[in-house]
């Protein structure tokens, strides 16, 4: 399975040229195999970016989110008690709570994470692709 972080999700939907060729290949392969996901907190992050006018989805927000999910048949993974607890372990030193949840989600599900975030690439227990 592959988990996309919020930026990778946005890039895939709106600006695919911002993805690296490797990230795009991994996303496409995972999508074809039905093994692509995101954390539910990414939907909230996108909503916040739209509310703050830092992202223009080009459509009504709810419809945009549904379209993003349907375009790749994304599995939206919930924050479970295990993921919440894992996100607070010492291995996650990232200051952004959403990034902690997203990386803990990938780790919990034994998934690769698609992310350009250099801090997340330093997590030795997590395979980060970019």
PLM regions and their residue ranges:
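Alpha-helix capping/helix-boundary segments
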Residues: 8, 42-43, 83, 102, ...
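Short loop/helix-cap segments at secondary-structure boundaries that form the rim of catalytic
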Residues: 120-126
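Glycine-rich, flexible loop/turn motifs
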Residues: 15, 51, 73, 97, ...
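Short, flexible helix/strand-to-coil boundary loops that buttress conserved ligand/catalytic motifs
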Residues: 13, 23, 50, 88-91, ...
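Phosphate/NTP-binding elements of NTP-utilizing enzymes
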Residues: 46
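Short, well-structured N-terminal submotif of metal-dependent ribonuclease cores
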Residues: 1-38, 52-67, 109, 118
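Acidic-histidine catalytic/liganding microenvironments
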Residues: 33, 71, 123
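Active-site neighborhoods of divalent-metal-dependent phosphate/nucleic-acid chemistry enzymes
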Residues: 56-62, 70-116, 129
């Amino acid at each position: 399975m592959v988990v996309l972080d919020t930026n990778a999700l946005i890039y895939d939907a709106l600006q695919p040229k911002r993805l690296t060729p490797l990230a795009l290949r991994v996303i496409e392969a995972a999508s074809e195999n039905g093994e692509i996901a995101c954390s539910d907190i990414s939907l909230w992050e996108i909503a916040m970016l739209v509310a703050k006018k830092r992202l223009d989805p080009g459509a009504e927000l709810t419809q945009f989110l549904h379209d993003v999910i349907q375009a790749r048949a994304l599995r939206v993974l919930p924050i479970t008690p295990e993921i919440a607890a894992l996100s607070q372990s010492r291995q996650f030193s990232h200051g952004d709570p959403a990034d902690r949840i997203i990386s803990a989600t990938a780790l919990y599900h034994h998934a690769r994470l698609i992310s350009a975030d250099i801090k997340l690439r330093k997590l030795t227990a997590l395979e980060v692709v970019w």
